[in-house]
Structure formats: C-alpha cells, structure tokens
C-alpha cells in the first residue's frame, strides 16, 4: 500500500518516487499546490475505495499522514 501511495503521488506531481519520504510535506517538500492536493486526495479515494472528508483532508499534510489515514480506514 505504501508503495502504491508513493506511485500515485509521483504520477500526480510528476516527480521521482525516490524523492517521496513519509515525512515529506506535499506543499513544502514536494511542490504541490492546493489543486494538486485535492487531486491527490481524490486519487487516494478512488484507488483505495475510501472516503476522505474535507475536514480530514485538511489534516493530511505529509505522505506519512496519508499512509496512516488509509491504513486506519482500511483497518490495517
């Protein structure tokens, strides 16, 4: 799952998977803008069949946040 999340981020942002670390912040470290973040959230929802409400999406700042959130939602 973690690798798939990184692949989605790399595809959406046009960056190398090697640049993506759990502590990487989407905006500060990976160069995402607010639209990129919205598109990433939608891609995660589709890929992992989870719903991420806006109030939760606002709290997701790093790659690790996404990994933990989806694992929690999927009961892993």
UniProtKB/Swiss-Prot annotation:
Transmembrane segments: none annotated. Belongs to the acyl carrier protein (ACP) family. One of its GO terms (biological process) is lipid A biosynthetic process. The keyword Lipid metabolism applies. The modification O-(pantetheine 4'-phosphoryl)serine is found at residue 34. The lineage of its organism: Bacteria, Pseudomonadati, Aquificota, Aquificia, Aquificales. PANTHER family: ACYL CARRIER PROTEIN, CARRIER DOMAIN-CONTAINING PROTEIN. Keywords: Cytoplasm, Fatty acid biosynthesis, Fatty acid metabolism, Lipid biosynthesis, Lipid metabolism, Phosphopantetheine, Phosphoprotein. The keyword Lipid biosynthesis applies. GO terms for molecular function: acyl binding; acyl carrier activity. This is Acyl carrier protein. Coiled coil: none annotated. Pathway: Lipid metabolism; fatty acid biosynthesis. HAMAP family: Acyl_carrier. GO terms for cellular component: cytosol; membrane. 4'-phosphopantetheine is transferred from CoA to a specific serine of apo-ACP by AcpS. This modification is essential for activity because fatty acids are bound in thioester linkage to the sulfhydryl of the prosthetic group. PROSITE patterns: CARRIER, PHOSPHOPANTETHEINE. Residues 1-74 form the Carrier domain. It comes from Persephonella marina (strain DSM 14350 / EX-H1). Its main location: cytoplasm. Carrier of the growing fatty acid chain in fatty acid biosynthesis. The gene is acpP. InterPro entries: ACP (IPR003231), ACP-like_sf (IPR036736), PP-bd_ACP (IPR009081), Ppantetheine_attach_site (IPR006162). It is found in: Cytoplasm.
């Amino acid at each position: 799952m973690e690798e798939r999340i990184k692949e989605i981020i790399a595809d959406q942002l046009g960056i190398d998977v090697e640049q993506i670390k759990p502590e990487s912040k989407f905006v500060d470290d990976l160069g995402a803008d607010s639209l990129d973040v919205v598109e990433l959230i939608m891609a995660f929802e589709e890929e992992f069949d989870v719903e991420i409400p806006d109030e939760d999406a606002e709290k997701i700042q790093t790659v690790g946040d996404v990994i933990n959130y989806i694992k929690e939602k999927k009961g892993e």
